[in-house]
Amino acid sequence: MNKIHLCTLAVLTSLSFSSLAKDCDANLLPSWKDSGSKTAIVNFVEQSTDSSKATFIPVSDRIAVFDNDGTLWSEKPIYFQIAFALDQVKALAKMHPEWKTQEPFKSVIENDLEKVFAGGKESLLQIMKVTHSGMTVEEYQQSVEQWLAAAKDKRFGKAYNDLTFKPMREMLTYLQENNFKTYIVSGGGVDFMRVWAPEAYNIPEEQIIGSALKYEYSFNDGQPKVMKLGELLTLDDKEVKVENIQYIIGKKPVLAVGNSDGDQAMMQWATSQPNSMAMIVHHTDEAREWKYDRQSDVGRLDKALDEANARDNWQLIDMKNDWCAVY
């Protein structure tokens, strides 16, 4: 390489690093560019924690709720818990020879996902029931652990629990360091998330709220156990998120973060008071992750997108332009 090329490379490298330094502060939310989203987060936290300001929020009221799928980790091309369920059907197929001719299991075994999803919610519910019930909570969570240790996302070649968003992990840490109590309020299965989310997000099991099948307690031969049944207890989506927040947390959050219309209700609930904020992760980066919103079957963002554009205390996070890194 001649001197001219070396000089050119040095200049370009210098410009690249200087641009990175300008855009990404290594000391505060380092995976966030210096954009409106980062400013909104920092301003909200600083105003909430400064006791000399009217915007001060007592520690006991610093409640922040986060969706999980599409907000804290990816959700494409299918929800990761669905990927787990499909793999479990294949693993259990040896014990169920009747599935070879019985839908939707036949299509799962044959990897015909188009036909599986053509069956709609009823097909998915059948799949979820046979893979998520008829066992103790401990047995179920062990199966999730084993799956996470072996399964890989086909596009990125990573373990599914390595596909959490680095900027969002930093945001959670920043809030936690400023005495915000962070909760997950997700449509995902609560027992599924409690296996891996505490380590990923530093959020304890008791602060994870999600969908659940009914449980049954029994005490036989001196042994207590809790079984997972094949009947829905709660589907933690849309307005049910607000109802579960009230039932379980008992306080209105001051910050709600989501990515889809399924999160709109809890964002409305959180921002129906002064000194509050909602944030929406907008998937705009098809190169590093996925690009989707209004027309997506998974994580559709339509009505909430319109509301975000009309509300002063709702902030859109533009994944492509606001994040220095995704994973």
Q: Regions from the language model: what does each represent?
A:
Residues 1-7:
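Bacterial N-terminal signal peptides that target proteins for export
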Residues 8-13:
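Hydrophobic helical h-region of N-terminal Sec-dependent signal peptides
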Residues 16-18:
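N-terminal signal peptide c-region/cleavage motif recognized by signal peptidases
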Residues 21-32, 36-42, 46, 61, ...:
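C-terminal cap/substrate-recognition subdomain and adjoining C-terminal extension
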Residues 54-58:
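Short loop/turn motifs at secondary-structure junctions and domain boundaries
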Residues 59-77, 267:
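Asp-based phosphoryl-transfer active-site loop
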Residues 75-78, 83-86, 195-196, 269:
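Short, solvent-exposed loop/turn and secondary-structure capping segments
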Residues 78, 83-162, 166:
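A metal-dependent, Asp-based hydrolase signature
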